[in-house]
């Protein structure tokens, strides 16, 4: 279980999506994902933020099933933390779908202190393309939400107009959050 400074455990009610995004972005190179296109015209960072956001929404809705929200978010955000343009014809990027989970995990381990659930989420999110299935419910959720988001991004002209996703994306990318209608910034 994660602990706050001073040693107090983090309760599920204290897990805030924007706070987790901010802390991960400050501790890593997560913002660099904005430089790479993932699916369609969607940036890798926007994809990662959207996957984490929808996983968090589902985990809160399915509360009685006991999802561990902090590891869920900390594993979902860097699930595609491979930090290269897989569309380049570079031979090192061949078989990207099969290889990128291990690369993302290596990058995440270099930059972040991961617990076993977070590492499992990153490494197993490409099942069934990668042969070993996820073993924990958080990794299963990220695996499924990742597939839904990927298909949506391929067919959507402007994916994720949701202000919470856009604000979290801006936070991770080090940008100013989008304005709310009426001119004031959206609180995150």
PLM-predicted stretches and their roles:
Residues 1-188:
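Metal-dependent phosphohydrolase cores
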């Amino acid at each position: 279980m994660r602990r706050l400074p001073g040693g107090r455990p983090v309760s599920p009610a204290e897990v805030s999506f924007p706070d987790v995004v901010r802390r991960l972005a400050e501790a890593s190179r997560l913002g660099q994902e904005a430089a790479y296109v993932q699916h369609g015209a969607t940036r890798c960072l926007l994809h990662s933020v959207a996957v984490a956001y929808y996983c968090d929404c589902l985990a809160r809705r399915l509360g009685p099933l006991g999802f561990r929200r902090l590891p869920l978010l900390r594993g979902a955000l860097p699930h595609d933390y491979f930090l290269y343009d897989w569309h380049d014809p570079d031979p090192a990027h061949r078989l990207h779908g099969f290889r990128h989970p291990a690369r993302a995990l290596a990058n995440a381990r270099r930059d972040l202190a991961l617990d076993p659930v977070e590492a499992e989420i990153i490494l197993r999110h490409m099942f069934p393309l990668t042969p070993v299935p996820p073993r924990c419910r958080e990794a299963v959720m990220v695996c499924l939400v990742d597939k839904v988001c990927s298909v949506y991004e391929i067919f959507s002209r402007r994916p994720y107009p949701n202000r919470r996703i856009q604000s979290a994306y801006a936070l991770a990318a080090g940008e100013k959050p989008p304005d709310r209608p009426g001119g004031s910034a959206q609180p995150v």
